Amino acid sequence: MVTQATSVRWQLWIVAFGFFMQTLDTTIVNTALPSIAASLGENPLRMQSVIVSYVLTVAVMLPASGWLADRIGVKWVFFSAIILFTFGSLMCAQSATLNELILSRVLQGVGDAMMVPVGRLTVMKIVPREQYMAAMAFVTLPGQIGPLVGPALGGFLVEFASWHWIFLINLPVGVIGALATLLLMPNHKMSTRRFDISGFIMLAIGMATLTLALDGHTGLGLSPLAIAGLILCGVIALGSYWWHALGNRFALFSLHLFKNKIYTLGLVGSMSARIGSGMLPFMTPIFLQIGLGFSPFHAGLMMIPMIIGSMGMKRIIVQVVNRFGYRRVLVNATLLLAVVSLSLPLVAIMGWTLLMPVVLFFQGMLNALRFSTMNTLTLKTLPDRLASSGNSLLSMAMQLSMSIGVSTAGILLGTFAHHQVATNTPATHSAFLYSYLCMAIIIALPALIFNRVPPDTGANRHLAR
């Protein structure tokens, strides 16, 4: 007979597999983009839509995931998430055109948007509150392994098999996870308040149209008139949501959140900072392969120091913030990240290849320091009644800003390279240098926002990871 403790451990393993699938897929695709472009007959400098479609879908669908889990039950929502993600992976591998791949990535994104938040919710429901921290540490460990092996595994599969396998490897894991969910996962439900479907649709339209407008000319080849129409539609949709949410206690996100100055400052700073940081995972593998002529596997291996730096920094973030305070940490980490990011193409083009892993290591450290500090600053002063809404809005804003960052990186590369691809040439080096210079400026600008954070010397025992 299976004991309750054993059953809970198996359930935690199911959630952990979901975390692993999500983080692996997030990092494995970037390294493969040039090879996917070659296979589909596309320009590798115009492949940002493959990333944007996925991240934007996650941003749009996140607000609905928690409500669905409470209404339908965590078991069936988590099962559906794994099925959608796995089927989306199969469709990605079967894609013969860029548009087919983009649509398949949207399907993956829907599954991802439900998988991780519902996984966290599942842990909250199946373990006692005093064991929650230990349980989350257990289920997120595979999620930390995913980014570590993702870039190198993606490069290896592309180089020694084909790009299709970066999606096909999700199939056996997905099938096992889905069966285990059916057999072992309890179906916890909770009473729910009315879901703000009108607000959800307005926000979804606003985010989607504005992001598509940003990527419209470079990635989608839209006309100026179509782009203007998308911008107008997005502005109207977001303005309509603001009007809809005024005095509406059932609004998807309460406007009372913005009466909290620290939350508003943290949210704006977090969004602007993640636009710059979102450019890095997209830009770096393309620079290594197109700019320097690295093989996909070599480019994937070069990304590992960045992940190690990020994981290492997470162990000392609390001490750093307690010592220097939020404002000094955020301002200095932001400016240092801009300098370190710009130094990568300079070091590489000058032939100092041995320094590149060091640069990427510090890039990962500074990124992790900013992310965790921003998350905690944004949420730390919210009252309990607004904590859930504020956290959901922050999660959505994080994904949205990352999609904007990838779109911006694609625009910069397309502009400076004039959409012409020639591997490891002076013209290509110049295009990447100009792109990195603009990216460094974008990364540095949020320091102006973070400089407005009030001086803070309070202890922070639990920083958001």
UniProtKB/Swiss-Prot annotation:
SUPFAM superfamilies: MFS general substrate transporter
Bilayer topology annotation: Multi-pass membrane protein
Molecular function (Gene Ontology), one example: transmembrane transporter activity
Transmembrane segment boundaries: 12-32, 49-69, 72-92, 138-158, 165-185, 195-215, 219-239, 267-287, 290-310, 329-351, 393-413, 430-450
GO cellular component, one term: plasma membrane
Localization in the cell: Cell inner membrane
Keywords tagged on the record: Cell inner membrane, Cell membrane, Membrane, Transmembrane, Transmembrane helix, Transport
Family: Belongs to the major facilitator superfamily. TCR/Tet family.
HAMAP family: MFS_MdtD (MF_01577)
Protein name per its UniProtKB record: Putative multidrug resistance protein MdtD
